[in-house]
UniProtKB/Swiss-Prot annotation:
Residues noted as binding pyridoxal 5'-phosphate in the record, renumbered to the chain: 65-67, 92, 143, 168, 243
Extra facts: Maps to a phosphate-starvation-inducible locus previously known as psiC.
Function, as annotated: Involved in phosphonate degradation.
Family listed: Belongs to the class-V pyridoxal-phosphate-dependent aminotransferase family. PhnW subfamily.
Protein name per UniProt: 2-aminoethylphosphonate--pyruvate transaminase
Effect recorded for residue 168 to A: Loss of enzymatic activity
Residues recorded with modification N6-(pyridoxal phosphate)lysine: 194
Species this protein is from: Salmonella typhimurium (strain LT2 / SGSC1412 / ATCC 700720)
Gene name of the record: phnW
GO terms of biological process kind: organic phosphonate catabolic process
Coiled coil spans: none
Cofactor remark from the record: Thr-243 of one partner binds the pyridoxal phosphate moiety of the other.
Effect recorded for residue 194 to L/R: Loss of enzymatic activity
SUPFAM superfamilies on file: PLP-dependent transferases
Amino acid sequence: MTSRNYLLLTPGPLTTSRTVKEAMLFDSCTWDDDYNIGVVEQIRQQLTALATASEGYTSVLLQGSGSYAVEAVLGSALGPQDKVLIVSNGAYGARMVEMAGLMGIAHHAYDCGEVARPDVQAIDAILNADPTISHIAMVHSETTTGMLNPIDEVGALAHRYGKTYIVDAMSSFGGIPMDIAALHIDYLISSANKCIQGVPGFAFVIAREQKLAACKGHSRSLSLDLYAQWRCMEDNHGKWRFTSPTHTVLAFAQALKELAKEGGVAARHQRYQQNQRSLVAGMRALGFNTLLDDELHSPIITAFYSPEDPQYRFSEFYRRLKEQGFVIYPGKVSQSDCFRIGNIGEVYAADITALLTAIRTAMYWTK
């Protein structure tokens, strides 16, 4: 381990500002009103406001990574007679399928392949053929490949068929403008350490209050009972059922202030988009090819094919980049040899320029 700080070019955890880190220097009592009412309740209100201006939505914070919240939603939102259609085109859609299977939740997995955009007509046909489906769940920004999925079109289907709509917006909420009411989303799931630019430690769910209120008694887990967590926060003014990750929460409160200072989600989206476009242009100039076509890319993370040169090893490429202060991500695509570069967090145009220079230096197989 080294004391040197790297620029994390990953989809989260990501590079955070010094002020977000410094917010964690304060110790809070989990029973204190200054913390629960002054911090937690403020966060809940701000998250709901970021998601939509429409009435009837609420938010719940939950200890753990984003996957904990995904499992909490699946395990709480679906009753014993319900069935979920899971749209999957990557590791995180597949993870939802695995969760549903382990919890004994009836589900239909529509897997369209890792590099294919979900076919909305195929989803329509599935819904038309199976009236027992009560819920639809999908990932928005699938970081396996960097693909941005059509949550608007699927949301329109969910609304037309009267289905409850669950969206894993882990790597998009706070970085891509959206109105969850207009998108017909009933449950949106995200995490502290993604586009809001906080640190790991908790996830959150922004939900239609009427839907959440109907979840009582559904949960397959004590600690992942979304309804019970929500009622505790509602009835006790921000109190968590079990130990709150206080330092992470304080960091997140600071991160929300910095999001507002940047100009909100629209301004952050613009920065991320420019980062991603500059990255792709620079990588192509160096001879790298993207896994996806441009129209499929999210502004969050990009997958690049590994060089075909027999000398190339990702581990050596990674080491050489890390020596220069940059950390990238290995590939997660099962059918292609790739690596991934994220461009969210405290990453700006100058950082992308510096990264491209470092990559040129690290391309030992071209020497």
